[in-house]
A protein has these predicted regions:
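Predominantly flavin-linked oxidoreductase catalytic cores and closely associated redox partners
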Residues: 1-126, 181
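Generic alpha-helix signal with a bias toward terminal, lower-confidence helices
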Residues: 15, 21, 50-54, 93-95, ...
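FAD/FMN-dependent oxidoreductases across multiple families
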Residues: 77-81, 85-87, 99-219
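A general structural signal for short secondary-structure boundary/capping elements
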Residues: 54-59, 129-130, 140-141, 203, ...
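C-terminal helical "tail/cap" subdomain of flavin- and related membrane-associated enzymes
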Residues: 187-324
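Short, surface-exposed, charged/polar-biased interaction segments
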Residues: 29-30, 39, 59, 104, ...
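Polar/charged alpha-helical tracts
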Residues: 53, 116-119, 130, 271-274, ...
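Short, surface-exposed, charge-dense and proline/glycine-enriched linear segments
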Residues: 2-15, 59-68, 155-165, 220-236, ...
Length: 324
């Protein structure tokens, strides 16, 4: 069966329908992050909040909300583990593993690797003691990252989730793709086939590629800091500074002049972040926290690094009077 269209938008994400046709060149070497995943759905996983309370009733007194109501991240030596709890009793769980710390060993089954990781962390092992997989097998990936050199042509375009993928750490995929939908909608509704549209699509291609590489910078730095949680938390503020600044600029901008995703076009922000990951290896945790706070100060609109928050924010759009 063949289908003809004047313009094709590939929204297949990892399916990469147009990419599979062979006309688009992949170039994952542009990305620094190298991670893989093992994941599944489970039932009867206890509430992490309840486990914390059982261990120490005072441990949650500063929590701004029940942690199980969020997309929970357990930061580990090899990477991190997600818990996404659904209302039907299922929980999506998975390890995202830094390949430099936990390379794929095909001689070890996915189940054995899963059990070895759980056994290494007593609190996680206890949580999964009575949980059970809803599918007989775990899913294990190879490298998660993908990147296409070309994102658009005269009669086709890839949405950001199809153009590339970095990592689920900061959950950027949906927001990035929606920003791409907005931009392609403007292009396709306001231009006709010809030079004007091709110029706009060329700019779209450049922007999406630059934004994906920027997400990679924000993610890769976090993985470099995994060995010290305080450094990891400090560098993660680069993402939150970029996200909150981007949201504010979107609100302040006209529909015709929207900022690049996560302020990827902001050279001052990129410069502020560029050397931080390297500095993490040379600084103590306290020194690195101060360095990150100083570098991000021009973009810190929501009280990031404020000691009273203890790295726990109920929301990141604090009133102007509540930012210290």
């Amino acid at each position: 069966r063949s289908i003809k269209a004047d313009f094709v938008v590939d929204a297949t994400g990892a399916g990469q329908a147009l990419v599979e046709c062979g006309a688009i060149e992949a170039d994952v070497a542009l990305l620094q992050t190298r991670t893989r995943a093992i994941f599944a759905h489970v039932e009867s996983l206890p509430m992490w909040n309840d486990l914390l309370v059982a261990a120490n009733p005072n441990s949650i007194r500063h929590h701004p909300f029940v942690c199980d109501d969020s997309a929970m991240h357990h930061v580990l030596e090899e990477g991190w583990m997600w818990w996404l709890r659904f209302h039907d009793g299922l929980t999506s769980v998975g390890f995202v593993l830094d390949e430099s710390r936990q390379p794929l060993n095909r001689n070890v089954s996915a189940l054995d690797e899963w059990n070895e990781l759980l056994a290494k962390y007593p609190s996680l092992n206890k949580a999964f003691r009575d949980a059970w997989l809803t599918h007989p097998e775990l899913f294990r990936t190879e490298r998660l990252q993908r990147m296409n050199r070309n994102v658009a042509g005269s009669d086709w375009a890839l949405l950001p989730s199809t153009a590339g993928f970095v990592d689920p750490l900061h959950s950027t995929g949906i927001a990035h793709t929606l920003s791409g939908v907005e931009r392609l909608t403007r292009i396709l509704t306001r231009t006709s086939a010809g030079p004007d549209r091709e110029h706009a699509l060329s700019a779209y291609c450049r922007d999406i590629s630059r934004e994906t590489e920027w997400v990679d910078t924000l993610v890769h730095g976090c993985y470099r800091c995994l060995s010290d949680f305080r450094k990891f938390a400090a560098f993660s503020m680069c993402y939150f500074a970029a996200a909150t600044t981007y949201e504010r600029r979107r609100l302040d901008s006209s529909r015709e002049n929207q900022p690049a995703f996560l302020c990827a076009e902001d050279e001052q922000m990129r410069e502020a972040v560029s050397g931080l990951a390297d500095a993490a290896d040379q600084k103590t945790a306290v020194e690195f926290e101060k360095l990150c706070e100083q570098a991000l100060r021009p973009f810190n609109h929501v009280g990031l690094f404020a000691p009273r928050h203890r790295n726990m924010y109920d929301y990141t759009a604090l009133p102007d009077s509540d930012m210290t």
